[in-house]
Structures are given as C-alpha cells and as structure tokens.
Amino acid sequence: IDTITHQSFSKEVSMVLTHTEVNKDLTVLELVQLGRQPYTNWMDVLSAEDQDFIQDTLRICDLQDLQKRKITQLSDGQLQRTFIARAVVQDTPFIFLDEPSTHLDLFHKVHLYKLLKELCVTKNKSILFSTHDLDLALQLSDDVMLIKEGVFYHNTTANLINEGLFDRFFDTDSIIFDRDR
C-alpha cells in the first residue's frame, strides 16, 4: 500500500467513514461527483457516461430530488446516503464502509443493504463493512467476520450460526440464534 499512488488506490478502494470532513459549500451533486475524480482528466471534466452514472446512482440512493441542496441543509441520514452514493460512483472493486446504516431510517437501511448485495452480485464488488445492525447484515451477507478478544472468526453466516459462534459471542441467554432457519 505504501508504494501505490493515491489515484491508483482511489481506483481500487472507495470508503465511507463515520466521520468525514467535507467542504460545507458543496451540493449533494457536487459531493457525489467527487467520486469520479480518479477517472477525470486534469481539468476534472466529467464525460456524458460519468454524468449518466452519477444520475443513476442519485436515483438508486433516493437523492435525485436533493441533488441541488447544500450538504449543510441535509439530515444526517441524507448526508450518509450522499457519502454512500459517492462511494458507489467511484466504481471500485472494493468498498469499505464503517457503520453505513448510521442515521438511516428502517426503509433506507433495508434499501442500503439490498443495494450493497446487488453491487456484489451484479457488479462483482467486494464489500466490507462494520455494523451493529446484525439482523439485517446477517440476512444479506455471504460471509461474516467477527473479532472477539483479539480472536478473528470468518465463515458463512450459516456456518457461524450452526457452529454456535454467535451464541458464544454474545455471552447471554437473551440472544439466541435459530439454527433451523
């Protein structure tokens, strides 16, 4: 990683972090357009294909009606969806997200996880995210990675449940994972 240029890295990995500083004067559209920056020329000119891709992503992320709004005028959930749209527009093989469903209502949480699943299936993306929304994440993830007391566990969701790892992970009788489902 030390030897790769920022531009090359930006073509491989897009990220959504929990705390991101960004120019407050940007509109939703301008912030999402920044995701295409690794692919633009020295004048940062976006192609017609870039513009179409951006508009499709704004629609998919339910942001089309907000694209001219300044990011300072957004709710926390709308801003989170804007950062997710920027990562999608960056069009990298790897997407890393830290708590991507933070500030999202239930509708947009479900929509987000379905979008991430669709990107994996249709666009062959590898997506790694951290979350406390285990119920939704377990339903839509192919593989799960858990860390407890410095020990790393990785397997399919079904295998981790069948092995009883989730039951041991929570150390409580109030949370039980159904092995029959």
Go through each PLM region and give its residues:
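H-loop/switch region of ABC-family ATPase nucleotide-binding domains
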Residues: T131-H132
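H-loop (His-switch) and adjacent beta-strand-loop-beta switch element
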Residues: D143-T156
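ABC ATPase nucleotide-binding domains
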Residues: F170-R181
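Conserved ABC ATPase "signature" region
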Residues: Q33, A48-L66
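Catalytic Walker B motif of ABC-type/P-loop ATPase nucleotide-binding domains
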Residues: I95-D98
